Design a protein with these regions (language model features):
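Extracellular adhesion/carbohydrate-binding repeat motifs centered on closely spaced tryptophans
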Residues: 1-386
Length: 386
């Protein structure tokens, strides 16, 4: 719709001299002219920009969507509610008032209709859309276009950047951006906190769709400029979860929702907490970075026995892997064992280095605070000392 009363209007007159217009209660009347599709309203004026197709509107069959189509007053219509994708698919775009021909197939970048997204309409913010060949929008779905996979919000806007998506039965139940008001993930700490505590347990998957004018879904190993730094991610390369961020081990490295868990250059080594629990009848595994050796030994499931108690300077202390040191040469020394403090959650602790490589062999690994993590032949931490 275009509400500018002062603009020039185009009309089409049939061979009998009568103008073409929508009648019999129709919203618009379609006409192919010189191979292009146009639409005319009840007054005969050519439709420009956005139009809601009356026949296609029947796709919006559920009660809430019909209400949104008639009142356009509920915020859910542009907040990612999966019930409204079919309503969006009933919209078509007819270019400018000077042109008016329908975009039948392909990409176009415009400001959304007010009834599709009032906030973006008020801000005069353009977004990318795709018409399916009949002029209808892709909405609430993944689509492969010329060999590349894209995703479209329920209001039709192409997705870009890093997103958490929860799929519904027919469309997207929810899409979260990194600046989400309640559960943001625009820095590493918030990413891990919210991915672990909310997104993964509730069925969301992390995807990356490139920059504002790109939108193509990434797969495999990907470097993203995230929070001002180049950050490594890994997204599924095939199968039903193609494009979803990997949670788990891949090529001897650990990922949470696609983000690589690794020590920074100052820390050298960090411990990752692998937690396994059941949520809504499903097994959920999450991975979280611990701050340092002290944080590791403070975990409820970790028992750190002080080996320097009741020793003298010359006492030989077993620091792991059949190695001994004099007590006077040690500042701290602990024997590490594990228990299960919560019967509903199983914790395992994995040591990783600055490349994210899982330490899975026998050795002594010195972190940035001069703590040594002693690991057995399977990479299990048996001792910590400094």
């Amino acid at each position: 719709f275009n509400d500018d009363d002062d603009q020039t209007r185009w009309f089409y007159f049939k061979s009998n001299g009568k103008k073409l217009y929508a009648d019999n209660g129709e919203r618009t009347k379609d006409k192919t002219i010189n191979g292009k599709k146009y639409a005319f309203d009840e007054y005969g004026a050519m439709v420009a920009e956005w139009s809601l197709d009356e026949d296609d509107e029947k796709k919006a069959s559920d009660t809430e969507a019909q209400e949104a189509a008639s009142t356009a007053s509920t915020s859910e219509a542009w907040e990612g509610n999966g019930k409204y994708a079919k309503y969006t698919q009933a919209w078509k775009y007819y270019n400018s008032v000077e042109d008016g021909s329908r975009v039948s197939k392909g990409w176009f970048k415009v400001v959304p209709a007010e009834m599709l997204n009032k906030e973006k309409y008020d801000d005069d913010e353009e977004s990318w859309y795709y018409a399916d060949g009949s002029g209808n929008l892709y909405a609430g779905e993944f689509k492969t276009i010329k060999g590349k996979k894209y995703a479209f919000r329920n209001d039709g806007r192409m997705l870009t950047g890093l997103k958490f998506i929860k799929e519904g039965d027919e469309d997207f139940a929810d899409v979260k951006a990194d600046d989400d008001d309640s559960r943001p993930f625009d820095n590493e700490d918030d990413f891990f906190d919210n991915a672990i505590e909310f997104y993964e347990p509730n069925g969301y998957k992390c995807y990356y769709f490139g920059g504002d004018d790109d939108g193509a879904m990434r797969t495999g190993k990907t470097t993203i400029n995230y929070d001002g730094e180049n950050t490594s991610f890994y997204f599924e390369k095939s199968g039903g979860k193609k494009g979803a961020g990997v949670t788990g081990e891949k090529d001897d490295k650990l990922y949470q929702s696609g983000m690589l868990l690794k020590a920074d250059s100052d820390d050298k080594y960090i411990v990752v907490d692998k937690a396994t629990k059941t949520v809504n009848g499903k097994t959920v595994v999450t991975y979280d970075k611990l701050d340092d050796a002290k944080d590791f030994m403070d975990q409820d499931d970790v028992v750190a026995t002080n080996l320097l108690e009741n020793t003298t300077a010359d006492t030989r202390v077993n620091i792991g892997n059949n190695s001994n040191k004099k007590a006077e040469d040690l500042t701290e020394a602990y024997k590490i064992s594990f228990t299960q403090s919560d019967e509903d959650v199983k914790h395992e602790y994995v040591l990783v280095n600055t490349s994210g490589k899982v330490i899975d062999s026998k050795g002594k690994n010195k972190d940035g605070n001069d703590y040594y993590y002693v690991t057995d032949s399977k990479g299990v931490i048996t001792n910590v000392y400094v």
